C-alpha cells in the first residue's frame, strides 16, 4: 500500500512537471515579446532625450538677468508679469528638482512620479526600463531551468506585462509633456528674449 501511494505521488509529480514544460514555450514567447517592447521603448526614449537641458538653463538665466538689470518702470506691467510667470513655470517643468523623482506604491508596485519635470521624467522611464529588463532576464532563467513555483509562472508573466504596459504609458506621457513644454518654451523665450535685447539697446 505504501508503495502504491508513493507511485501515485510520483505520477502526480511527473504530470505536474510535464504540464509546466508544456507551458514553457508560451511563457518564453511572452517574455520575448516584452523584451521586444522594451527595446522599442529604449529607441523612442533615446530619440526624445533632451540633450540641450543645460543650454536652455543658461539661456533662460541670461534672459532673466537682462530683464532684471535693464527693465525699469514706474508702473506695473501686468502683461509682462504674466509672461514672466509663465516663463518661470515652464522652466520648472524642464529642470529636475533635486532629491525628487519616482517612488513606488508599496501595495500595487505602481511607479508614482513625484517630480513632473522633463529631466526627471527621462530618468524615471530610463531606470524603469533597465529594472524591467533585469527582472525579465531573471524570470526567463527561472522558467528555462524550472526554478521556483512553476504554478506561479503565468501569474508572474501577467504581472510583468502590466509593468511593461505602465512603462509604455509613462514613456508616452514623457514624450507628450516634453514636446509641449519645449514648444511653449520656444514661443515665450523668443518673445521675452527680443524684449530683453531691446531693453539693452536703449541703455
Residue ranges and their predicted role:
Residues 137-203:
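C-terminal amphipathic alpha-helix
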Residues 23-26, 30-33, 45-48, 52, ...:
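Non-transmembrane, amphipathic alpha-helical segments
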Residues 8, 71, 91-94, 98, ...:
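Short, flexible helical or helix-coil boundary motifs
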Residues 1-19:
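Sec-dependent bacterial lipoprotein signal peptides
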Residues 92-160:
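Surface-exposed, polar helix/loop patches in the mature regions of secreted/periplasmic/lumenal proteins
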Residues 19-90:
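Immediate post-signal-peptide N-terminus of mature secreted/exported proteins
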Residues 33, 37, 61-68, 72, ...:
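Subset-of-secretome marker
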Amino acid at each position: 500500500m505504501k508503495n502504491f501511494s508513493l507511485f501515485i505521488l510520483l505520477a502526480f509529480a511527473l504530470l505536474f512537471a510535464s504540464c509546466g514544460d508544456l507551458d514553457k514555450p508560451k511563457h518564453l514567447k511572452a517574455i520575448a515579446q516584452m523584451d521586444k517592447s522594451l527595446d522599442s521603448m529604449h529607441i523612442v526614449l533615446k530619440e526624445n532625450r533632451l540633450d540641450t537641458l543645460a543650454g536652455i538653463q543658461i539661456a533662460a538665466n541670461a534672459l532673466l538677468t537682462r530683464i532684471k538689470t535693464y527693465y525699469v518702470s514706474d508702473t506695473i506691467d501686468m502683461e509682462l508679469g504674466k509672461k514672466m510667470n509663465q516663463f518661470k513655470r515652464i522652466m520648472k517643468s524642464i529642470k529636475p528638482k533635486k532629491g525628487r523623482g519616482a517612488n513606488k506604491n508599496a501595495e500595487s508596485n505602481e511607479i508614482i512620479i513625484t517630480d513632473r519635470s522633463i529631466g526627471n521624467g527621462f530618468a524615471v522611464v530610463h531606470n524603469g526600463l533597465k529594472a524591467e529588463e533585469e527582472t525579465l532576464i531573471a524570470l526567463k532563467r527561472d522558467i528555462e531551468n524550472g526554478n521556483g513555483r512553476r504554478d506561479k509562472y503565468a501569474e508572474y508573466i501577467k504581472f510583468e506585462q502590466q509593468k511593461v504596459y505602465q512603462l509604455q504609458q509613462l514613456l508616452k506621457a514623457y514624450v507628450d509633456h516634453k514636446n509641449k513644454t519645449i514648444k511653449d518654451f520656444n514661443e515665450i523665450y523668443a518673445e521675452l528674449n527680443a524684449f530683453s535685447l531691446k531693453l539693452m539697446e536703449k541703455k
